[in-house]
From Swiss-Prot:
GO terms for cellular component: cytoplasm; prefoldin complex. Its main location: cytoplasm. One of its GO terms (biological process) is protein folding. CDD domains: Prefoldin_alpha_GimC. NCBIfam families: prefoldin subunit alpha (TIGR00293). Heterohexamer of two alpha and four beta subunits. The lineage of its organism: Archaea, Methanobacteriati, Methanobacteriota, Thermococci, Thermococcales. It holds the Pfam family Prefoldin. Keywords: Chaperone, Cytoplasm. This is Prefoldin subunit alpha.
Length: 147
């Protein structure tokens, strides 16, 4: 009986650890998805800019709190893109779009790996729950047999 209780406690502890890991992975997955969506939105904006016929199109520049300033794109043939660690570089629109595509693919791969790891953890959680349920059923059967 004491051994069964120890097994149940050990299973509960393992379950809590795996559940915490799964929660961290789910949060990471959410952050990765947000990052990917941001890169996708920038890419789409640059693709749409290529279609604009005006040489210096007018735009709205967000300044926060839902407020904007009217502005003008001085050079619609290039964009300044972040390359990480606080650095940015000027690229042609096509090069910028290519760079963004590569980053989106990196995000897609990280998302895929995170989803796989999360699915594996969920499978392990399910196995632990089944083991615990089996132990509890065995204990209940022994208890009812003794009565």
């Amino acid at each position: 009986m004491a051994e069964r209780n120890e097994q149940l406690e050990r299973l509960a502890y393992e379950y809590q650890l795996l559940q915490a890991q799964a929660q961290l992975l789910a949060q990471n997955l959410e952050l990765l998805t947000l990052g990917r969506n941001e890169f996708q939105a920038v890419k789409q904006t640059l693709e749409e800019l290529k279609k604009v016929e005006d040489e210096k199109p007018e735009i709205l520049v967000p300044i926060g709190a839902g407020s904007f300033l009217k502005g003008m794109i001085v050079d619609k043939n290039s964009a300044i893109v972040s390359v990480g660690s606080g650095y940015a570089t000027e690229k042609s629109l096509d090069d910028a779009i290519g760079y963004l595509d590569a980053r989106i693919k990196e995000y897609d791969e990280a998302i895929r790996k995170t989803q796989e790891a999360l699915a594996k953890l969920e499978g392990q959680l399910q196995e632990l729950a089944q083991k615990a349920q089996k132990l509890q059923q065995e204990a209940a059967m022994r208890f009812s047999v003794k009565e």
